[in-house]
């Protein structure tokens, strides 16, 4: 019963939460589920890493053709506790700031758009540059970093001079924070986490592209939100209950009842009229007078 209450509370918090809170919930839920599954398999000396690769984004184009859904699923997967912790902290801080200037639907759209653009740039780089080619066949990417960087970049483009307080460095303008993050990714593009840094750049470009296009009246996330709305409506579909109850097969019985009732009423009126002729109006009872009056109105 206690567990049921906890699950109910979590569902209610998710339902009432802002979009960035909902995205954090989804990421954390996926992380817990995949981690618990991995632990269970390890207890029996089994590895499930190969299964999870089908949810991660491969650098190999041939492998990607076999698992195209990974362009969406990879942005909800994480490699460890610190990986998801920092991504979710950034999503929490900048998700709230993003909503000061854009809508909730824009945020979920930019999250997906940033992840897609980051993933595509990662695949392109690994298949174009000779430096990455030896790693292409066995490289996989996962994490929400590109999606989060898209949110940071879009907010930075919209409000470049917004003051951000940093614990050790004091207050700096948002545009400088974004430039530091992007600059770091450029410097470490050939590091051991090359795919992640490339994806960050793709996400950041997507965020700037979105904000710049929106300022000119074009919403790059509209198609994403249409797809998501359709998906949500399918998941939440409930057949509409009929407003009226319809009964079949009883028509003859109902006609018979109706006709019998009409005949009884007619016989009663005939009896009252006969009494009226013989003994006059005053001889009728109150009930008979009422029946006669009702019949005259039909």
Go through the PLM ranges and name each one:
Residues 1-264, 268, 272:
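A detector for small-residue-rich transmembrane helices and their helix-helix packing motifs
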Residues 263-298:
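Terminal membrane-proximal soluble interaction domains of membrane-associated proteins
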């Amino acid at each position: 019963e206690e567990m049921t209450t906890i699950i109910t509370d979590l569902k209610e918090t998710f339902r009432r939460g802002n979009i960035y809170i909902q995205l954090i919930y989804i990421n954390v839920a996926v992380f817990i589920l995949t981690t618990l599954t991995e632990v269970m398999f390890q207890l029996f000396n089994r590895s499930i890493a190969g299964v999870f690769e089908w949810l991660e984004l491969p650098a190999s184009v041939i492998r990607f053709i076999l698992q195209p859904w990974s362009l969406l699923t990879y942005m909800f997967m994480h490699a460890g506790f610190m990986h998801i912790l920092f991504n979710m902290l950034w999503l929490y801080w900048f998700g709230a700031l993003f909503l000061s200037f854009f809508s909730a639907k824009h945020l979920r759209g930019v999250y997906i758009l940033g992840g897609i653009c980051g993933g595509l740039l990662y695949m392109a780089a690994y298949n174009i540059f000779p430096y990455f080619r030896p790693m292409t066949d066995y490289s996989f990417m996962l994490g929400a970093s590109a999606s989060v960087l898209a949110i940071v970049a879009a907010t930075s483009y919209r409000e470049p001079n917004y003051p951000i307080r940093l614990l050790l460095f004091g207050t700096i303008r948002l545009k400088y924070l974004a430039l530091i993050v992007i600059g770091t990714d450029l410097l470490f593009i050939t590091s051991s986490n090359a795919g992640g840094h490339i994806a960050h750049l793709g996400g950041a470009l997507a965020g700037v592209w979105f904000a710049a296009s929106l300022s000119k009246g074009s919403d790059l996330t509209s198609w994403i939100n249409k797809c998501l709305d359709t998906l949500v409506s399918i998941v939440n579909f409930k057949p509409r209950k009929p407003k009226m109850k319809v009964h079949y097969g009883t028509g003859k019985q109902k006609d018979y009842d109706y006709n019998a009732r009409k005949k009884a009423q007619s016989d009663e009126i005939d009896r009252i009229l006969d009494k009226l002729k013989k003994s006059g109006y005053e001889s009728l009872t109150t009930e008979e007078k009422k029946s006669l009056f009702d019949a005259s109105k039909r």
